[in-house]
Design a protein with these regions (language model features):
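Secretory targeting and sorting signals
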Residues: 2-32
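C-terminal His-loop and adjacent cap/lid subdomain of alpha/beta-hydrolase
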Residues: 33-153, 161-536
């Protein structure tokens, strides 16, 4: 296998995509009513809810009575020192977002829809806090604009969790909901993230704390130090694969036994991805392609072993970074160590996939050796009270009492398809038990299926290579990969589906639905599609 160089380093997801919309100054304290500029054709209003969360409203002169309430995604609750890839220089902000982008907001305003959104009172995991804020914001908006007839809740990432949460807890306040690339329950998603960081620590750098951070500034320094160490590992692995794709060197920080280092380090990457449920397609690596011009045997090796390792590496980089923020934030919120893997059966998690990805894992002996090492090392043990507190920070029932659109990319490395599938499974279970319950209560109607799940599925092949045969990660992330990687057309199509549902009390269906999602691009409605379940 020839050596190669990346055109540029692996792409990391930005912390957040804040809107570049000019709005009037944001109040820092709560006020009784919004401060509106009275401009036309679009009036902008700002204010703060009783918890101090700033909000923004934008209302067109031809307001049609429907307002979209947007909930933004995860933002770290601590500043990040400069120099850390993807996140360096971030400062904590509660700037409100009334929509996913300026282009989408503009399209909605042009059609007579109003938009609004909060910056929320706290960043990090904030599901319960955000729920209270959104409830108050809806009330504030309706009092300011009494001609409002419909409220549509939507959001992405953690904001997708919040939109689904609002639909479950207070369906009387909204007419439809959109939960995009959503997070699942607080404990489940946090465990998934922490699993990834713990496995990186286990295989590649045991000095990574991965939790149990100290109090005060010392703990903050430890968490930021973990970020640096994670990206050092990622850089080392990337360099090792570039020099020797078949058998890349283990990072210098790794302390695994010398005997285990006979297994290619790339196989440990693949195992981490499989153990945590990360997709085996990433923004730039499809797990099937090879550079042109390679001998047949080398091309097959690249397809079966190297490309999957690069996909795992790109996805792990994003998952582990978020894990550091999440672990630290939840330890601050709960007052103790909440992550626990003392009862985790790691081998059971890959009972089937180890055969599917046997080449990428370097065979059965290598897989057994890697799993044996994971089983033998000391485990993370939680404070039961802290773990219970995390579980109380937000849980979905999956029961949607208003029409709800779900949409995610199946190769999202942060909140993958399994997160959306968990909502579908809960909703299906509710429908299954509700029909006999209705019959027993002499209710002749079946429970209404309010979920419309849509999927973004990547192409089978999309990895690009330079003329020299090196992977090219400078191109845009492939649709269906990366976190909340949606186009303006896709966001607009979702918004239109939500407007139809709000007006009609049910989803668009049949030919009109299929036509709309086809025109949006990379949007699939398939009743038979079932995404993999979460690993924990």
């Amino acid at each position: 296998m020839r050596n190669f160089k990346f055109k540029r380093s692996l792409t990391l997801i930005a912390v957040t995509s804040l809107l570049s919309i000019t709005i009037v100054s944001i109040p820092t304290v709560a006020q009784a009513a919004p401060a509106c500029d009275g401009k036309s054709p679009v009036q902008s209003c700002v204010g703060a809810t009783s918890d101090g969360a700033p909000y923004s409203m934008m209302v067109p002169a031809n307001f049609n009575g429907t307002v979209y309430l947007w909930s933004h995604g995860y933002r770290p609750n601590v500043p990040v020192p400069a120099g850390i890839p993807g996140y360096g220089g971030y400062t904590v902000t509660n700037t409100p977002e009334p929509g996913p982008s300026a282009a989408v907001i503009g399209a909605l305003l042009a059609k007579g829809f109003a938009v609004m959104g909060s910056g929320f009172a706290r960043q990090g995991w904030n599901a319960n806090s955000a729920l209270k804020t959104n409830i108050e914001l809806i009330d504030t908006y309706k009092k300011q604009f009494p001609k409002t007839t419909k409220v549509i809740s939507w959001g992405n990432s953690l904001g997708g969790f919040q939109s689904q949460y609002l639909a479950e807890k207070h369906p009387e306040l909204i007419n439809s909901a959109g939960a995009l690339c959503l997070s699942s329950d607080a404990l489940a998603i946090s465990d998934t993230a922490a699993d990834a960081l713990w496995l990186i620590k286990t295989f590649f750098d045991p000095t990574i704390k991965a939790g149990n951070y100290s109090a005060g500034t010392a703990g903050y320094a430890e968490a930021m130090g973990d970020l640096v160490k994670v990206f050092t590992v990622i850089g080392s692995m990337q360099a090792g694969i570039a020099v020797n794709p078949t058998a890349p060197a283990w990072p210098a920080t790794s302390k695994v036994p010398d005997a285990l280092k006979a297994v290619p380090s790339r196989s440990a990457l693949v195992l981490i991805a499989l153990l945590t449920g990360l997709p085996m397609q990433s923004a730039h690596f499809d797990s099937t392609s090879a550079p042109a011009g390679l001998p047949a045997a080398n091309a097959l090796s690249f397809q079966l072993a190297i490309n999957p390792a690069l996909a795992a590496l790109e996805n792990i980089a994003n998952a582990a970074a978020l894990a550091t923020f999440q672990i630290y934030d939840l330890e601050l919120q709960t007052g103790g160590v909440w992550y626990d893997n003392t009862a985790t059966d790691w081998a059971a998690r890959v009972a089937d996939e180890r055969f599917i990805w046997a080449s990428a894992l370097s065979g059965e002996s290598a897989t057994n050796a890697l799993l044996g090492y994971v089983a033998a090392v000391p485990k993370a043990k939680a404070n039961p009270d802290a773990r219970a507190k995390v579980a109380a920070l937000g849980t979905h029932t999956g029961i949607s009492k208003v029409p709800t659109v779900l949409y995610t990319g199946v190769a999202d490395p942060i909140l993958g398809a399994s997160q959306q599938q968990s909502i579908i499974d809960k909703h299906d279970a509710y429908l299954a038990q509700q029909w006999p319950a209705n019959r027993e209560a002499a209710v002749k109607k079946r429970a209404v299926n309010n979920l419309l799940p849509l999927w973004g599925i990547p192409a089978e092949k999309y990895t690009k290579f330079t003329a020299a045969g090196s992977p090219d990660t400078s191109v845009a992330a492939t649709p269906g990969t990366n976190h909340c990687n949606f186009t303006t057309k896709q966001y607009t199509a979702i918004a239109e589906l939500l407007a139809y549902a709000a007006d009609n009390g049910k989803h668009l269906s049949g030919g009109p639905l299929l036509t709309k999602i086809r025109k949006a691009g990379n949007m699939t409605y398939d009743r038979g599609y079932v995404a993999p379940k979460m690993k924990n």
